[in-house]
Amino acid sequence: MRKGDFARDDLAYAVGLDNWIDPEDRHFKQAAVRAALYQRLTLVERECAKSPLPALLQDNVQRLATLVGLDAVDERILAFAVCLHTDPLLDDAADMLESLTSTQVYQTLAMLLDVPDAQVRQALGSQGLLARSGLVVVDRSGSGRLILFPLQ
């Protein structure tokens, strides 16, 4: 969100703020848009808590978890990384965060996945199974991006 509009209208539309894209009947007010966004977030969080992952993704994550020995936090991070790399809008939204430090990546993932920061840090650390197996690593070159299957 910028001062008088959205940086990306397609992302605003995707998160349910389409009535604020070029509003003709009112002035774009950041505080009102932010309040609408938080209201939408509360609703979406409740909906998502009830919604499982797509069956194929869940199946594949479970198979990899069994093969590699991933725990529940590893599985959630892996599933999120897959979604991040396969959903263009989610990837674009993540790109808007620009460069994140490793610590900021851990904190953001912990918040998004509703798991303790320390568990995310351990899962994505160099000794974590995700990194050792080559499934997911954090790009430490400055971008802070999650890299899925970095060994390809």
Annotate the PLM regions.
Residues 1-152:
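Intrinsically disordered, low-complexity N-terminal extensions of AAA+/P-loop NTPases
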